Structures are given as structure tokens and as C-alpha cells.
Regions:
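Noncatalytic, basic helical substrate-engagement surface that gates or grips nucleic-acid strands
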Residues: 1-65, 69-93, 169-171
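Non-catalytic nucleic-acid-binding/docking modules located in mid-to-C-terminal regions
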Residues: 35, 57, 78-80, 90-171
Length: 171
């Protein structure tokens, strides 16, 4: 949130009815012996990513289960990210190999793809008229978001190039 002030800016405040349940949820987790973590000013995905990396350093294999596709960027040789497809009945297991097979990109490129496409749920505007197909094509040609902008001058004139230039700060 410090890198991009508008990040998640359109998100509604957590309803009081839900917030009131937090103490009961914490108590239930304690009684079940399930560790839980929270830290002011940090979102759950930040904590999940940090704990996952710490577990990897201790030679643990990690499985993250979530409905948040943003967590796909955390997949690596020791981390599988299971994304729910239909409620909690069906999951899709993302590994670096599966991401490459499914989309043709790496976990690092997944982050860049999101920057190019934007994400309304996180209030990330992205580049005008860049969707998944075009974003992936650009990443395959240039390797990364940085690579796209390093080579922008050699791209032929087009509306896409114009949008990339005009929306650079949004990517």
C-alpha cells in the first residue's frame, strides 16, 4: 500500500457485524490449537507470503489454500497455491510448472501481468485495453514489465504502444 497509495482504495470498510466476530474466531482457533497471526497495517496475503517464505527457509514444503488469485505469485518449487474454483468443493493447484502450462508465464510474470491488466478488486488501473492475452504476449516477447518499457521505443507505432506510454504509471 505504500508503493501505490490507491491500492485497494475502492474497497468498502469491513462491516461491523463481521468485525464483531473476530474475537470469537480467534478464541475458536485457540481452542482448536490452530495458530493465527495478525499484524496492524498488514493484509492477510502479506502475512501468508512471509510465513510461507519462512517455512521454506526451514525446508518445509508449503501449501497455501485460498480464493485469492493474487497468491499465485507465491508458487515456487516448495510452494503450491490451491485456488478455490467452486466454493470450497473444487480447487486448482498452481505450481510454477502448471502456471507455465496453463498461461505460459512464470510466477514473477504473473505479477507483471496483473500490473498490465489491472485489477478492479485491488484498485489497480493497469494499462488501457491490455487484457490477459495481450499482456501475456507482451511478457513473452519482453520477459517482464521492465523489459516492455526498456524496449518501448523499438515497438511499432500503435494504439497499444500509445496506451503503454500514457498509462506507464498505472502499470
Amino acid at each position: 500500500t505504500e508503493m501505490y497509495a490507491e491500492y485497494k482504495g475502492g474497497r468498502a470498510k469491513t462491516p461491523d457485524e463481521f468485525r464483531e466476530q473476530f474475537p470469537f474466531i480467534r478464541e475458536m482457533l485457540d481452542h482448536l490449537g490452530i495458530r493465527h497471526y495478525e499484524l496492524a497495517q498488514y493484509e492477510a496475503d502479506d502475512i501468508i507470503g512471509t510465513l510461507g517464505r519462512l517455512a521454506e527457509k526451514d525446508s518445509f514444503d508449503v501449501t497455501i489454500v485460498s480464493g485469492d488469485k493474487d497468491l499465485i505469485q507465491l508458487t515456487d518449487e516448495h510452494t503450491v497455491v490451491e485456488i478455490s474454483k467452486k466454493g470450497v468443493a473444487e480447487f486448482e493447484a498452481f505450481t510454477p510448472e502448471y502456471l507455465m502450462e496453463k498461461m505460459g508465464i512464470t510466477p514473477a510474470q504473473f505479477i507483471d501481468l496483473k500490473a498490465l491488466m489491472g485489477d478492479k478488486s485491488d484498485n489497480i488501473p493497469g494499462v488501457t485495453k491490455i487484457g490477459e492475452k495481450t499482456g501475456i504476449k507482451l511478457l513473452l516477447e519482453h520477459g517482464s514489465l521492465e523489459g516492455i518499457y526498456e524496449n518501448i521505443d523499438s515497438m511499432k507505432a500503435s494504439k497499444m504502444k500509445e496506451n503503454l506510454v500514457n498509462d506507464k504509471e498505472q502499470a
